Amino acid sequence: MTTIAVVGATGQVGQVMRTLLEERNFPADTVRFFASPRSAGRKIEFRGTEIEVEDITQATEESLKDIDVALFSAGGTASKQYAPLFAAAGATVVDNSSAWRKDDEVPLIVSEVNPSDKDSLVKGIIANPNCTTMAAMPVLKPLHDAAGLVKLHVSSYQAVSGSGLAGVETLAKQVAAVGDHNVEFVHDGQAADAGDVGPYVSPIAYNVLPFAGNLVDDGTFETDEEQKLRNESRKILGLPDLKVSGTCVRVPVFTGHTLTIHAEFDKAITVEQAQEILGAASGVKLVDVPTPLAAAGIDESLVGRIRQDSTVDDNRGLVLVVSGDNLRKGAALNTIQIAELLVK
């Protein structure tokens, strides 16, 4: 008998988790949903029955003892507070926030890349990577295995759903506020008032913001999104000295993160070799032109526009474009795939 819990079940990613649990016929005999007091008591239909959402603030170690796996997508603060409680009760926690990713005693797993790290549990917690890192890893791991990755230069173009419901609502409201005046931006960027900037530094509608995430106060002038890309790539690939430079950009797209990747390798690797490798890679779909709209709603990372990097000698560099659904594989799906590894 397997019992699974979804913490943050009523949120944006939690909703996708619930859908995927049903779609994939996850082998759980009992499912429990948890959320904040605001959503507690709400009834959610799941597999033909209604399940009442439980108040996470009322959870005790005793009340959680039947749970085998707990899927967390309730934010870092809630994860720090409640994930250890679930683990102490005997559950293995798979956490979607950034709370545990840098902890040396918590494995950071992409199911297609480093699944065996699930056997290295110390705290009973497994971390899910950031959605931008997630899109890149299934693509980069097989290329690394073939040629030895040594350096990455990445620009990411991240959808507003990566900022949560606030990001989605802000873009929708700004587009509506500008209305038919949008073409006036051709000649004047101040021609129309988009209204409240929401979680962003400037209007996101009809704009591109080269500032995704929050500025890290460490003198690097990087955002936390850019540092996550570096730190998480190193940890997942087992390359602590990997050189990674990234610029994370927020774009007016609802779902789907896109990355342009300049990858340098220790050994030569041609475009044809890369295409053959990626065509056979798990969690990857080779396409001509990856786009966020094409990626939205599918499981795989789309990869295309593969070229030789002319700035790297001896055919040791590749340029490629990756698009991935930041809510699906970038958050919910990988969490569930890890849980599937745990209950096999």
Swiss-Prot record:
Domain of life: Bacteria
InterPro entries linked to this entry: Asp-semialdehyde_DH_CS, Asp_semialdehyde_DH, Asp_semialdehyde_DH_beta, NAD(P)-bd_dom_sf, Semialdehyde_DH_NAD-bd, Semialdhyde_DH_dimer_dom
CDD domains documented for this protein: ASADH_C_bac_euk_like, VcASADH2_like_N
Annotated binding of phosphate, by residue: 101, 228
Keyword Repeat: no
GO biological process, one term: lysine biosynthetic process via diaminopimelate
Pfam families listed in its UniProt record: Semialdhyde_dh, Semialdhyde_dhC
The keyword Iron-sulfur is annotated on this UniProt entry: no
Residues that bind NADP(+): 10-13, 38-39, 161-162, 326
Catalytic residue list: 131 (acyl-thioester intermediate), 257 (proton acceptor)
Binding sites annotated in the UniProt record for substrate: 158, 250
Annotated GO MF terms: aspartate-semialdehyde dehydrogenase activity; NAD binding; NADP binding; protein dimerization activity
Enzyme kind, highest EC tier: oxidoreductase
Catalysed reaction equations from the record: L-aspartate 4-semialdehyde + phosphate + NADP(+) = 4-phospho-L-aspartate + NADPH + H(+)
Family according to the record: Belongs to the aspartate-semialdehyde dehydrogenase family.
Subunit structure: Homodimer.
PANTHER family: ASPARTATE-SEMIALDEHYDE DEHYDROGENASE, DEHYDROGENASE, PUTATIVE-RELATED
Descriptive protein name: Aspartate-semialdehyde dehydrogenase
Organism: Corynebacterium melassecola
